Structures are given as C-alpha cells and as structure tokens.
Curated annotation (Swiss-Prot):
Keywords: Chloroplast, Plastid, Ribonucleoprotein, Ribosomal protein, RNA-binding, rRNA-binding. HAMAP family: Ribosomal_uS19. Transmembrane segments: none annotated. InterPro entries: Ribosomal_uS19 (IPR002222), Ribosomal_uS19_bac-type (IPR005732), Ribosomal_uS19_CS (IPR020934), Ribosomal_uS19_SF (IPR023575). Its main location: plastid. Pfam families: Ribosomal_S19. One of its GO terms (cellular component) is mitochondrial small ribosomal subunit. It is found in: Plastid, Chloroplast. One of its GO terms (biological process) is ribosomal small subunit assembly. This is Small ribosomal subunit protein uS19c. Belongs to the universal ribosomal protein uS19 family.
Length: 92
C-alpha cells in the first residue's frame, strides 16, 4: 500500500539537514548514507549520494527523473553471476 499523501515523503532527518546545508552553501559534495528507504525529493537534484548496499557505498548522481523513487532502488544489493551454461558435452 502506498504512503498517505497527508504524511508526505519519508526522508531521513540527517540526510535532509546535510542536503539543505549544502544547498545553502552552494557546494556539491558526496554525501554518505545508509538510509536506503529515503525518498528522493527535488532538493537533492544535482547532488551525489553514496548509498550503502550492504558491503560498500555506491555513488548515485541524482537527476530529475529520480524524484519520487527511493535511494535503495539505485544501489543493487545482489550480484548476478550469470546462469550456468548448458554444457551438453559433459552430460554424455
């Protein structure tokens, strides 16, 4: 079920404070966060946010098309190694 509109989007407080302070100073620094559940708001456009995927922080550059999505959507947590090739020679 979707979040109620009267509540507004969830953005972690510490992340919102960092974004607002960087916007006030006019700086563009990489912001490290573990908050994958935070929703991207228009104030984040143009910033690079390093989102934790369980092992490392992956840098994500925020564009206008990402607004409304969650930060965790852009930092995959699982590595796909590929399916095993069908080796018919070894079966015989």
């Amino acid at each position: 079920m979707a979040r109620s509109l009267k509540k507004g989007p969830f953005v972690a407080d510490h992340l919102l404070k960092k974004i607002e302070s960087l916007n006030a100073q006019g700086e563009k620094k990489v912001i490290i966060t573990w908050s994958r559940a935070s929703i991207i708001v228009p104030g984040m456009i143009g910033h690079t946010i390093a989102v934790h995927n369980g092992r490392e922080h992956l840098p994500v550059y925020i564009t206008d098309l990402m607004v409304g999505h969650k930060l965790g959507e852009f930092a995959p947590t699982r590595t796909f190694r590929g399916h095993a090739k069908s080796d018919k020679k070894s079966r015989r």
